[in-house]
Structures are given as structure tokens and as C-alpha cells.
């Protein structure tokens, strides 16, 4: 999941070198924290959060084969 989020985020931003993805696996869920440069926040979130929602939807679909819930947090 980490690699998927990283590829998507790097394709959206102007500063791909600043993209950082941290994956934390717990009993009940997989937590993915996406950090981007402050200038790129708007590009990753999108108008009314549409791009952020799309990223979460793609990750959820990719994780549907597993038994854990995936939570994507953008910072």
C-alpha cells in the first residue's frame, strides 16, 4: 500500500522529492500517513477534497483482498 500511495502522490505534486509515506500496521488496520511539501497540499487534497477522496478510494480497493482496514491520513 505504501508504494501505491507514494506513486500516486509523486505524480500529483511539483516537489516529488518531498513526498514521504509512513505505513504503520496495527491489529485492526493499516495506517498510511502521507506528507507532502506545504506548496503541494492543495494539489493532493484537491477542490473540496476530491483528489484526497479518490486516493483513499483507490487504496481501499487495492486493500479489499486483505482483512485489514486501510486509513490514509494526509499531512
Regions found by a protein language model. Name each.
Residues 1-43, 53-75:
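RNA-contacting regions in translation and RNA-metabolism proteins
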